[in-house]
Design a protein with these regions (language model features):
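Conserved hydrolase catalytic core segment
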Residues: 38-80
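Helix-rich cap/lid subdomain of alpha/beta-hydrolase
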Residues: 74-137
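Conserved catalytic-core motifs of eukaryotic protein kinase domains, centered on the activation segment
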Residues: 14-20, 80-83, 181-182
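Conserved serine/cysteine hydrolase catalytic core
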Residues: 128-190, 195-198
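Catalytic active-site module of serine/aspartate enzymes centered on a nucleophile-bearing elbow/loop
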Residues: 192-227
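Active-site loop/oxyanion-hole signature of alpha/beta-hydrolase fold enzymes
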Residues: 4-47, 216
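Structural signature of beta-strand start/N-cap positions in the alpha/beta core
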Residues: 2, 39-44, 65-68, 167-169, ...
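Alpha/beta-hydrolase active-site loop signature
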Residues: 8-12, 76, 203-206
Length: 227
């Protein structure tokens, strides 16, 4: 498969928003621009967490465009416990003296091995001009997670998943405190041609916690729709 991995605004290597706008509407506009700019049509869309929500909203806005949609550990509703845990983690000091300090923090947060952490962390942090290390994401994105986007209430998000018209796969980590079993089951009932699956030995960061089973599940839907 040809894979295009997009960093959304304020994340990864994509620029920070000059106006601090990290609303769902702004991210939908970014997705429109990327997909149109690359000339994508009849393709498979996959997103995790924030990216998963952005993906199912985009899919609902563009019927008869996708070959498949994969949503990873998110839905129209998320659990307060997990939201608070992530928010508290993101509120920790964002300017550390060494790469290893970041690695130790991530190991404590995720329970992953040193090898797993070091393999992913190098893409997520950067060294600043003063020699310290910080996350690549814009600190302004922290405010996005504190309150729901008023233009996108839960009821509207449920309407979005019900409007998705392509085959879909919804994955949940069995230890996730963000995405509940009840929401997973409901999505499986209300979405058209939807398969749901729980990935064992995984929290919210499904693809990093159990990459083997995640890839197996992802390849399953890709194989089915790309024959």
């Amino acid at each position: 498969y040809r894979v295009i991995a997009v960093d959304q605004r304020g994340h990864g290597d994509t620029d920070w928003a000059d106006d601090g706008d990290y609303s769902l509407d702004s991210m939908q506009a970014d997705m429109d621009g990327v997909i149109e700019g690359l000339g994508l049509d009849d393709f498979n869309l996959m997103g995790h967490s924030m990216g998963g929500r952005n993906s199912f909203i985009w899919a609902s806005r563009h019927p008869k465009t996708l070959r498949s949609l994969t949503i990873v550990d998110t839905g129209p509703e998320t659990q307060r416990q997990g939201q608070d845990r992530i928010r508290n983690f993101r509120e920790l000091p964002n300017n550390l003296d060494s790469f290893q300090e970041f690695a130790d923090r991530i190991k404590e947060y995720t329970g992953r091995t040193e090898e797993q952490v070091l393999g992913a962390l190098k893409y997520s942090i950067r060294q600043t001009s003063d020699g310290k290390w910080s996350w690549k994401w814009d600190p302004a994105t922290k405010s996005r997670g504190r309150t729901a986007d008023p233009k996108w209430p839960v009821e509207k998000l449920w309407e979005c998943v019900q409007a998705v018209d392509c085959p879909s796969l919804v994955l949940r980590g069995d230890r996730s405190d963000i995405f509940s079993e009840e929401t997973l089951a409901k999505m499986g009932k209300v979405m058209v041609d939807c398969t749901t699956e729980t990935i064992s030995n995984a929290g919210h960061l499904v693809q990093g916690d159990n990459p083997v089973d995640f890839i197996t599940a992802a390849r399953g839907i890709l194989s089915r729709v790309n024959r």
